[in-house]
Structure formats: structure tokens, C-alpha cells
């Protein structure tokens, strides 16, 4: 189900992530979108975003997103949410307890749906 309002992106992301559905996650991004998968890193384009999202999915945790802000101006929207990933396992075997406040930009498509253009999953954290 596509997002017909920008604020729907968070719920759709949470649903697809918790279902382990990388293709449903990818359907939320423009082909040339960018994702910040960790502070100081940038994944640009479909292949890089898919690989980054797969890393998070491989943690096998559950994610929750709480929308904090949506500012819509014309065909652009700025969004923020607080996300947390719990119940999974990091590659070293330690518990996966991750979370941050995001900074995201979405764009209205010609078909009336909204897709991510920029998804900074670590919007409130500086690069190391």
C-alpha cells in the first residue's frame, strides 16, 4: 500500500521492516534516494539502500517509529521520527538496542504517492 500522505511513510516502514520485507521497504524510496545508515555514512541509490536496510533486517529485531514532525511545502515534506530497534542481535552476538531521531525528506510523486528522497536515520547524531 503506497503512502498517499507523507506521514504514512513511517507506519509503512515499520510494517514492512517488522515483516522482514526488504522489497516493501525499497518501494518507499525514490530510485536515486539517499539513506544515512549510520552516522557519517551515505548509501545512495537502490542497491546501496537495499544493502543497508538488509543489514538492519538481519538483526532480526522489531522496530518502532514514533512520528514527531511533518512539515509539508508543495511537493516536498520534511519528517522526523524517533525509532528504536529492540530484540535483535548484533553481528558480535550482543543485543541489538539501537535508536535515534531521524531527519527525512519525502517528495510527492506524479501518481499522488509519497516516497523518501533523503532518509537520515541518525539525524540527531554527528559523524564520529
Language-model regions, residue ranges each:
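A beta-strand edge to alpha-helix "cap/lid" segment located at domain peripheries
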Residues: 1-24, 34-128
Amino acid at each position: 500500500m503506497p503512502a498517499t500522505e507523507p506521514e504514512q511513510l513511517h507506519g509503512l516502514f515499520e510494517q514492512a521492516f517488522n515483516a522482514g520485507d526488504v522489497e516493501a521497504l525499497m518501494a518507499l524510496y525514490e530510485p536515486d534516494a539517499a539513506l544515512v545508515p549510520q552516522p557519517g555514512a551515505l548509501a545512495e541509490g537502490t542497491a546501496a539502500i537495499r544493502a543497508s536496510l538488509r543489514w538492519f533486517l538481519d538483526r532480526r529485531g522489531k522496530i518502532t517509529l514514533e512520528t514527531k514532525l511533518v512539515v509539508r511545502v508543495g511537493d516536498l515534506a520534511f519528517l522526523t521520527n524517533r525509532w528504536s530497534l529492540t530484540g535483535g542481535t548484533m553481528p558480535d552476538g550482543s543485543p541489538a538496542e539501537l535508536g535515534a531521531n531521524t531527519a527525512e525528506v519525502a517528495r510527492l510523486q506524479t501518481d499522488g504517492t509519497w516516497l523518501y528522497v533523503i532518509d537520515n536515520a541518525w539525524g540527531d547524531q554527528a559523524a564520529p
